[in-house]
A protein has these predicted regions:
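Conserved alpha/beta enzyme-core scaffold
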Residues: 1-191
């Protein structure tokens, strides 16, 4: 199980890919934590994304390659036209799930420059699109019906700046297993 470097209490975060690590290691006969010094130290809401070193049977440490970086191309004319139409339909306080690619990134950039306020994040993949909204003061998560105040996501993919944001401000995030993020019941609780 890939984990972040431990904090002073010996707790580690479960990294940028949260598909089902907790479920996997809670059901495994042998648990090996691989400490990756490059992973953000996210520990989740109420420790939902936290593990203690004592929960591992073995711990492996070593040097790691930089995290994968996602780059974005300039938006095409079609991306821009689609994004304009989408942005027109998004009300203040909307909870967003943005994918990865030209259109979602263009939507986020247009929202960042718009008069929309108090947007929320409940998404499979948190990316630089959400970072752009946060930097513009648009991403507050204030009006979310669940996980109020937190950006909820299952996978992080983007720039080093995105990973640094996750590492430096972990109190803003609720990284969660795929069954939590994509639960139809949970999604149905939001407007």
């Amino acid at each position: 199980v890939p984990v972040s470097r431990p904090d002073a209490d010996g707790c580690c975060g479960l990294g940028i890919s949260n598909y089902a690590w907790r479920t996997i290691f809670e059901n495994a006969r042998t648990v090996i934590f691989e400490i990756n010094e490059r992973l953000p130290r996210l520990q989740g809401v109420d420790g939902s994304h936290r593990v203690h070193l004592s929960e591992a049977d073995f711990i492996v440490e070593g040097e790691h390659e930089p995290l994968p970086i996602r780059t974005y191309r300039d938006p095409s004319a079609v991306d821009i036209e689609i994004a304009k139409r989408v942005v027109e339909e998004i009300p203040d306080g909307a909870v967003l799930s943005l994918g990865v690619g030209g259109v979602p990134f263009t939507v986020a950039n247009m929202l960042a420059q718009s008069d929309k306020t108090d947007l929320g994040c409940h998404t499979g993949t948190i990316s630089d699109a959400f970072l752009a909204l946060y930097k513009a003061g648009k991403l507050t998560n204030k009006k979310k019906e669940i996980d109020n105040g937190y950006s909820t996501w299952n996978l992080a993919m983007g720039s080093q700046e995105l990973y640094d944001w996750l590492d430096n401000e972990p109190q803003l995030f609720h990284p969660a297993d795929v069954d939590y993020v994509h639960s139809p019941y949970r999604i149905g609780e939001m407007k």
